[in-house]
Amino acid sequence: MICGTLVTVMVPLKMLFPWRKWRNFWTKVMLGIGSLFIWINKGIFLLVHRVVWEISGLKKLDLNRQYLVLSNHQSSVDIPVIQGMFHKVIPFPRFFIKQQLLWVPFLGLALWALDMPVMKRYSKSKLKKRPDLRGKDLERSRKACEQLRDQPLTLLNFVEGTRIDPSKHSDQNSPFQYLLRPKSGGIHAVLQALGDQLEAILDVTIIYPGFQSPGLSDLVFGRLRRIRVDVDQLCIGEDGVPTLEQIRSREAGVHIRKWLNERWQRKEQLIKQYLEEQGEQEFSEIMETQAAVPDPV
């Protein structure tokens, strides 16, 4: 609360002058405050709730580079987990926000001040009425990313677009047992705008043993005792990742979707193997158990 208030209070200072150096200075100050907030949350994880972290793949990372982080999205706990895990390891994580969030009092100002890239999506009905808008969301996302060039940066993208739950899993007719279908739009924009500057793509797989989708209450009240995270470092043009030439081609969407589907197949096998080794319940059993106990948070 205090950190959020400080960021909001500093927004007028950032807006005072249009000079790039001035605004960059205040952005760095606000990111420092955001980093302090993450440090406090991480301390709560480690000291108060004594959560056991099982993390693999955190090596040869740099605070002064640019990274794209991809992750499965299981719960509201995912963001504090990723922020805490990467704190002081890579730059402060930013993520795409919906344009509507900018109009939320105080929150919108803070998100703008932290230079969160804004995404505006059009519904199928809107595109049917206005076919000229097709592709505009991708172009806007690409331009938002271009404004973040030439600075240390981490962009976090939950590729599934939403948190998993039984109804969404069923509605999508997902081919995966533990995941929703990956969406390529946001990744496409990032790779086109920043692909030549990215140090690495970090493919993150989060697993909560005993839970498919834990709530914040499970964390706060100590029911979430263990968190497993696998980080796979990838480079453009290697490890099956499309090359810069493919990313900038007319067939970029096809190449990126194919690659993401391959990554999600690997992620599915990784989760399945880990849960089998731990003797965990099947996906459907865990979801049915959690659906019977609503999360108050």
Where are the predicted features?
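A short, well-structured juxtamembrane/interface segment
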Residues: G43-Y67
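A cross-family acyltransferase "interaction/gating" segment
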Residues: L102-Y122, R149-L244
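Surface-exposed cleft-lining segments at the edges of enzyme active sites
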Residues: S123-G135, S174-Q177
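A Trp-anchored, charged/polar loop motif used as the substrate-binding/catalytic surface
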Residues: L133-E146
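Catalytic core of membrane glycerolipid acyltransferases/transacylases, capturing the structured
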Residues: P12, L16-F37, L63-R130
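N-terminal membrane-anchoring alpha-helices
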Residues: M1-R50, E288, V293-V297
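Accessory terminal regions of nucleic-acid processing enzymes
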Residues: T243-V297
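Short His-Asn-centered micro-motif
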Residues: G57, L70-H73, I97-Q100, F158-E160, ...
